[in-house]
A protein has these predicted regions:
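C-terminal active-site rim and adjoining tail of enzyme catalytic domains
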Residues: 134, 207-321
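Short, aromatic/His-centered strand-loop micro-motif at the edge of beta-sheets
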Residues: 413-436
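Carbohydrate-binding surfaces in secreted/extracellular proteins
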Residues: 259, 360, 430-460
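Metal-dependent phosphodiesterase/phospholipase catalytic core, i.e.
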Residues: 38, 97-204, 234-238
Length: 492
């Protein structure tokens, strides 16, 4: 048995109940779902292909590596969690990705040089998730024992000691809690812990970084693995846009070890690699990327937290995320010239092939000095790959409104310049004044108009080239001081 082998090796080595979307709440449903202990063996037999592993819990939309994040991922259906482990100076194991507290918490400095008493004085703080998560009391950094006690045997856990000093204590805890059958050892592909885990009979999650993506490095990594392990590759080269060559993925797949990509944020990215025969995806938004239907027909900006499927270019970036500036508003106002959000929570639109309308309101806090500045709504995309004006990876259209009131409709695609389909003049926008906009999509035509000015001109275009169901919205302006606020976005 795996557990028996793991125990021997380890001893030798180290002689929607509560609503999980509400910050701070969420009760794991794993115990209600499981009919028996979930082991690596049972998960491998039942997971099918493709499968998904929850990355940092649901780290795109919840404070990463927190109990609410892990609970949310399990509530979404995850049967495998990825968990990072560090150790404090007094030997307490905690769940945190970085070696220091700086990036994700209110604490400062290295975990390893501070005692566990610091945990009572800090909390997880990731502003890009929304102000609902930055209110007091902040979400706590959990102890590993708390995580293993709640989820052990209910889901598979991929455990990584980010600080290698934590590895012996981490594995001793796993053994003490009788969880060896339910744990996969996660480690960097060249780690000395991989042969140690293999010798103990434990399966391995071996990952590469973008800098490692060569045939030679992949060959060396897979030489240490077998079909019971996972070879985990980055899905992009670090720009969140560019996929690796098909030939490289084929070479990795040829070794026979199940191939997994990470960290997946968008459905299109998972679909691309699944078509190449990749077995699984490590995803930071399990409930979104593991499904293919819309979760809502209107925004949830009043909640003051990012929604599942709502994606800036880089989901972990504070500078590219929206901000929540009033009761029900999302504001785009960073120092970036282009700031766009994929509205995946509303996608794919169920009526994409027939007729629907999009309605929302927008206002600039001050009018941009840049004459080319515009609000932009991208629509009819075939997938949820990232879009911003001037960068389109999918076929579709975008509708714009300039501060001078001009409305325009364009068609765009990855291999052709934007094509202006039509335009109309409406009264100029005033700073702080809300404009309500409406886009109507039918099988043969597109209408873009000001719903707040029903007698003004509209753009009517007869074009049926693309009718996908994905959306993005954003602003383009060289005048980064002008923030654009959005509210009341709905699909009907």
């Amino acid at each position: 048995m795996l557990g028996a082998l793991g125990g021997l090796g380890l001893l030798a080595a180290c002689s929607r109940a509560a609503d999980p979307s509400t910050p701070g709440s969420g009760t794991s449903s794993a115990s209600r779902r499981a009919t028996g202990p979930v082991t690596v063996r049972s998960w491998a037999a039942e997971r099918g292909t493709p499968f998904h592993i929850a990355h940092r819990g649901a780290g795109d939309i919840y404070p990463e590596h927190s109990m609410p994040s892990y609970r949310a991922a399990v509530e979404m259906g995850a049967q495998c969690l990825e968990v990072s482990v560090n150790m404090t100076s007094d030997g307490v194991l905690i769940c945190l990705h970085d070696l220091s507290y700086d990036r994700t918490t209110t604490g400062k400095g290295l975990v390893a040089t501070q005692p566990s008493s610091v945990l009572s004085r800090i909390g997880i703080r990731q502003p890009q998730l929304g102000p609902a998560w930055t209110r007091s009391p902040l979400t706590a950094v959990p102890r590993l024992e708390t995580v293993l006690t709640e989820f052990g045997g209910k889901v598979v856990i991929c455990l990584e000691a980010k600080d290698d000093r934590a590895y012996p204590a981490m594995m001793a805890m796993v053994a003490r809690l009788n969880l060896l059958d339910s744990v996969i050892v996660k480690a960097y592909h060249s780690s000395v812990r991989i042969p140690e885990a293999k010798a103990a009979g434990l399966p391995v999650f071996a990952y590469l970084s973008p800098a490692d993506m060569t045939v030679a490095t992949i060959d060396a990594a897979t030489a240490r693995l077998d079909r019971n392990d996972l070879l985990v590759l980055p899905y992009d080269n670090g720009d969140y846009l560019t996929y690796y060559p098909d030939e490289l993925i084929a070479a990795a797949k040829a070794h026979g070890t199940p191939l997994v990509v990470y960290p997946i944020h968008r459905r299109a990215d998972a679909a691309h690699y699944f078509k190449l025969g990749v077995s699984g995806a490590v995803t930071s938004d399990y409930g979104y990327t593991s499904t293919d239907t819309a979760a809502a027909t209107s925004d949830n900006w009043a909640s003051k937290r990012i929604s599942s499927g709502e994606k800036p270019k880089m989901p972990d970036s504070r500078s590219l995320a929206g901000s929540w500036t009033a009761l029900n508003e999302l504001t785009l106002g960073t120092d970036e010239k282009r700031q766009f959000i994929t509205l995946g929570q509303l996608c794919p639109i169920a009526a994409a092939a027939s007729q629907y309308r999009l309605t929302f309101s927008a206002a600039w806090d001050r009018l941009p000095a840049d004459p080319s500045a515009a609000l932009s709504l991208a629509f009819c995309h075939l997938d949820d790959r990232y879009y911003e004006d001037g960068l389109s990876l999918s076929e579709g259209y975008h509708a714009t409104m300039s501060p001078d009131g001009t409305l325009r409709l364009y068609r765009h695609g990855p291999s052709a310049p934007d094509e202006l389909l039509g335009q109309a003049r409406t009264p100029p926008v005033q700073a702080g004044q809300w404009a309500t906009l409406r886009l109507i999509v039918s099988p043969q035509a597109l209408i873009w108009r000001r719903a707040d000015l029903p007698d003004s001109e509209q753009v009517l275009v007869h074009d049926a080239a693309v009718r996908g169901g994905y959306l993005a919205i954003g602003r383009s302006s060289a005048d980064v001081r002008a923030a654009l606020a959005l509210r009341e976005f709905s699909v009907s």
